[in-house]
Amino acid sequence: MGPGPSRAPRAPRLMLCALALMVAAGGCVVSAFNLDTRFLVVKEAGNPGSLFGYSVALHRQTERQQRYLLLAGAPRELAVPDGYTNRTGAVYLCPLTAHKDDCERMNITVKNDPGHHIIEDMWLGVTVASQGPAGRVLVCAHRYTQVLWSGSEDQRRMVGKCYVRGNDLELDSSDDWQTYHNEMCNSNTDYLETGMCQLGTSGGFTQNTVYFGAPGAYNWKGNSYMIQRKEWDLSEYSYKDPEDQGNLYIGYTMQVGSFILHPKNITIVTGAPRHRHMGAVFLLSQEAGGDLRRRQVLEGSQVGAYFGSAIALADLNNDGWQDLLVGAPYYFERKEEVGGAIYVFMNQAGTSFPAHPSLLLHGPSGSAFGLSVASIGDINQDGFQDIAVGAPFEGLGKVYIYHSSSKGLLRQPQQVIHGEKLGLPGLATFGYSLSGQMDVDENFYPDLLVGSLSDHIVLLRARPVINIVHKTLVPRPAVLDPALCTATSCVQVELCFAYNQSAGNPNYRRNITLAYTLEADRDRRPPRLRFAGSESAVFHGFFSMPEMRCQKLELLLMDNLRDKLRPIIISMNYSLPLRMPDRPRLGLRSLDAYPILNQAQALENHTEVQFQKECGPDNKCESNLQMRAAFVSEQQQKLSRLQYSRDVRKLLLSINVTNTRTSERSGEDAHEALLTLVVPPALLLSSVRPPGACQANETIFCELGNPFKRNQRMELLIAFEVIGVTLHTRDLQVQLQLSTSSHQDNLWPMILTLLVDYTLQTSLSMVNHRLQSFFGGTVMGESGMKTVEDVGSPLKYEFQVGPMGEGLVGLGTLVLGLEWPYEVSNGKWLLYPTEITVHGNGSWPCRPPGDLINPLNLTLSDPGDRPSSPQRRRRQLDPGGGQGPPPVTLAAAKKAKSETVLTCATGRAHCVWLECPIPDAPVVTNVTVKARVWNSTFIEDYRDFDRVRVNGWATLFLRTSIPTINMENKTTWFSVDIDSELVEELPAEIELWLVLVAVGAGLLLLGLIILLLWKCGFFKRARTRALYEAKRQKAEMKSQPSETERLTDDY
């Protein structure tokens, strides 16, 4: 098949307008390959809006002169002035020059005869095709209209018309190809037959055939026509689809060739983009009698995608059979931002094509990717055909270049030509039409002609591709002994290059300059080698060819070399610098001076230099590093658990490393032996023994030796500060990893785990362990009590809980438990609890379960109340001015006992358990317990005692389900001394009137007695004699001896 036009035919004007309204989006960034975008051949012709470039073709003229031409259709071009026609369309031929405006209009003489045919707006140039070297040219006008008359009424038939011209683009009347009418449609029929067939919407040549597409035939079902010439015989073929439906557009695009479904016979491939609304491609073969028979139909997969609007044939995998590419420019995937597709069907050795594509290429949304597709030949001369795909509505238009291989078309484009980067003012819809497969500048590489709707065509010429066929990189010596290095050289590297042209042109001997970069130890920082005369491990150089050249470079070892085990990798990469034009000049610039390296070749080479090592004859060290590790105490005792508290400050880790020979491993030197420790944030490196063996950053690195010798042993003792253990810490994990640059494949990381038992530290204290109180007054029963003051004297205990330093945060609860003396042994109330309040970061009541606090619901007193003084209490118990029962008193003759003790441990009191949770708080928490002495119990049962002492216990403990958190219980005692204030009984008081009466009666009685004595002469004075007699008698009485004296005198 010749290099005919390979753009998708564009028939109706309405369709063209719709395409122009599409918005470009997306993009693809691909490194350029060998289509040159600097030295473009750009042509502009026609009047503005002529659509110059709507169709394009490359043509080689060999008659009358030797030259290459760029053919471009301008279907909206103005007519040659004749006074009757305004617009007909045109075809321009453009020479291969550096000028933009030297195109000539092709001479196709069409006379205007409105009575028989209409050439106004016939779209001449909608199709342009070349038969190849020394071949003819085909030009079509699909809107050419014939006029039929029925009486005075005319009927118009848009049958279309195609013109064949000679190799020199002139009419040769002796050539049957050119003089044949090529009128395949019958204008005497209507649109239901071929009266509106629009012949020439697509068309092309082979060596002995010319073919046309007519998508308007049979109510726009469409048809395909072919004229075949064999020597003097001429045969016409056509295809009428048996399906009874219109609007399929068969013939919208056509390609004809062999090695499709038969190695010799030709196969017609025609697109029908509206077949069943999803589009299809028909494969037809010749039948006797001039018919084309349908052999296979490939259907599209999406409604409205216009599958089949562009097709191309190319042997992608070099199996000798032509493969098929089908464009679907309106294909879309909304979620993936895809717009346009190319379906690739690989030929199954001439039997058929698979129903589903082997590859589906996508373009960006709104790009119309696949609106044009063309086989452009082997542009890089790698032996495989290449493909160009147009995306005219992506920005200002783009053309994607795909290469192929033995497996078919490569998925990723090798080059993307961006219309906006070409620097052409007014350019748009770049890539609307494509034509290739011809080397127009004769440099052995086919070129590509690209058309647009903006009155521009652009020729992209292929640059020569250079293969580097001989590249060597040889170090000397290959095994380096640092002891043999000199001040000027340790390693010498020799590198050599040679090239050829991929097209195999033996005359191509251009002087090219190859830039190369050598880098020593690229994967290591810092590198171990540097180039002589420099401190750098990188060297940049240039080679000038075509003759093979070699170069030698000297390298030196860096100072303080540590790694002498791993080889030094010396890498080389090279490139061909972009050469800028020497100076402006007239004429078309040859691209032979601007070659490009073959991108399919590896542009990098490397070699390595080994170190001389004491590791056996193979120079390969096989170490046997082994390690034991454990957490230990300061007495070197192994720890399985860490009993942590805030007093713990240090933790020790003992590590033993050996490198000894075993039956399985030789235990040779371990180069760059390193121990890496990954420790949790709770541990901070404090010290290492031996000193300086380890360095800490986020990870701890301990250098064991370089090398760590055979049979060497080493012990490390690492001390850590424990700084971050919390209640959430269940364990401490340390990962230990031995590493060496020697060969050892069993160096697995060791995970060392130390369980942590966290011991909370807090305190429990009291403001006053022992309180003073009293009892006395009257006995009152429960039913008579209304307020807590009716119970008895108040008590107030204050407990203080020290802060833990760290909140439990849901891991447990700190609880204050009280062993509270609640009753005496006979069940009577003892100390009646009225209220418990917790004060920390706030204040709230504590309500232990069991309704043990103020169970009688008595009215609480003012929180500010304090116990009354004994004097005040005595006055309150004074019955003189009050009412009610008299206070209980002690018998005046009875003396009370001194003291008794009530405690639950002796059974003389019964206790209940009260619990109050202590909140997480960084401050001291106060727990206040208020109670009342049950006065009646003490009056009834302990009235005989001066003092009753009641004892209780308080315990602070931790309640948690986590076994690693614990706390030592804190216990304290509390008590109250309750003194008796009962008074002794007093004598009964006598009424005043009785006293007055008694006094009066006494005085009266005394008077009577005196009177009586007086009457009896008691008050009369005695005589002198009687007086003296009395005195003498008294004296006699005084002088009488006593009985004792008398008894004494008897002896």
From Swiss-Prot:
Isoform 1 is widely expressed. Isoform 2 is expressed in brain and heart. In brain, both isoforms are exclusively expressed on vascular smooth muscle cells, whereas in heart isoform 1 is strongly expressed on vascular smooth muscle cells, isoform 2 is detected only on endothelial vein cells. Residues 855-889 are annotated as: Disordered. A motif (GFFKR motif) lies at residues 1017-1021. GO terms for cellular component: basolateral plasma membrane; cell periphery; cell surface; excitatory synapse; external side of plasma membrane; extracellular exosome; filopodium membrane; focal adhesion. Keywords: Calcium, Cell adhesion, Cell junction, Cell membrane, Cell projection, Cleavage on pair of basic residues, Disease variant, Disulfide bond, Epidermolysis bullosa, Glycoprotein, Integrin, Lipoprotein, Membrane, Metal-binding, Palmitate, Phosphoprotein, Receptor, Repeat, Signal, Transmembrane, Transmembrane helix. It is found in: Cell membrane; Cell projection, Invadopodium membrane; Cell projection, Filopodium membrane. Disulfide bonds join C94-C103, C140-C162, C185-C197, C485-C490, C496-C550, C615-C621, C694-C702, C846-C904, C911-C916. GO terms for molecular function: collagen binding; fibronectin binding; integrin binding; laminin binding; metal ion binding; protease binding; protein domain specific binding; protein heterodimerization activity. One of its GO terms (biological process) is exploration behavior. Ca(2+) 2 binds at D378, N380, D382, D386. This is Integrin alpha-3.
